[in-house]
Amino acid sequence: GTIGNSRVILLKPATFMNSSGESIREAAAFYKIPHNRILVIFDDIDIRFGSIRIRKSGSPGTHNGMKSVIEHLGTEGFPRVRIGIGPAPEHHDLASFVLSEVSEDRKEGLYDSLVKACDSIEEIVSNA
């Protein structure tokens, strides 16, 4: 597809996020995409629900999916958009919280944060 005048490819790995680095590496190699032109968009339990954080590069923090991406790309040098879904409720299993259906009381807030994320993605791609 396109965003503005830029051609884009949206890759949604069929694996769990924690193993997504391999498919991102394979797609980057197949399409000959330099690492700094890959934009990874992901949810993050360490960021307050509804918040968006944008980074040009950096460490994976506690996010195992980003650890996989960095390991398979061999670099931290790619931009990312983090969509806050945290914190998990107390005494709640982290994996089941992250993989669960969004509760009704959070759907509107999730929609708003996704709109912010989409606006940010458009700006990042347009200014790349």
Indicate residue ranges for each PLM-predicted region.
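Nucleotide and nucleotide-moiety/phosphate-recognizing core
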Residues: 1-57, 67, 71, 75-81, ...
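Hydrophobic alpha-helical segments within soluble ligand-binding/sensing domains
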Residues: 62-65
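Active-site oxyanion-binding pockets that recognize sulfate/phosphate
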Residues: 103-107
